[in-house]
Amino acid sequence: HFEAAYPDVSVEPIEFDFADPTAGLAGGTTEVALIRPPVDLPEHRMLVLDSESWVACLPRDHPLAGRHEVEIAELLDDPIVCAPLTAGPWRDYWMAMDARGNRPPTIAAVAATYEAETTSIARGLGISFTTSSVARFYDRPGIVYVPIVDRPPSHVALVWHPGTLSPQADALIRHVQQNWGFEDGDETPLDQH
């Protein structure tokens, strides 16, 4: 663990809502963050730490709620609960804009947290697209999660700006690289995902 290897360095976990999917990197309030691309940070680098499949979060009485899996096209006409406009390309990604062609989504509600999102869905306002881990952590009465079989995986990445790192942040990145089996040069520009 990083703090055992570097006892004089404190890692401060800070949670950001959907309004800032860059987790403070864009505004410079954080040096290193765990995020889900895509985000608009062209000068940043990342290490992809994990990948997850997409799921649909549906009201329990939705016509497809009893299915074992769905395709994205089956859900594109449903009203959607989405992130705030400030989320930029991240919002578009989670509304599956790439699969919609020129059909704009019907926005049922805007939610800046998973709690607000799942509450809106449980109330029957709309659906959302998210990841399989959210299905494990945010199960609640009134909603059901159904795997989406035809979406590329969503990635979890450690992200940083290489030109502005403190020695402590650089040590954290090197620690992750060494302990997760990454080689020098395994990091990629953020715009490649």
PLM features: what roles do these ranges have?
Residues 17, 71, 112-113, 131:
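Short loop/turn segments at beta->alpha junctions
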Residues 36, 65, 70, 79-101, ...:
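Secondary-structure junction motif
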Residues 41-48, 52-53, 114-164:
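Beta-alpha-beta core module
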Residues 44-54, 58-80, 167-170:
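Flexible hinge/capping segments at coil-to-helix
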Residues 144-193:
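A late-sequence structural motif
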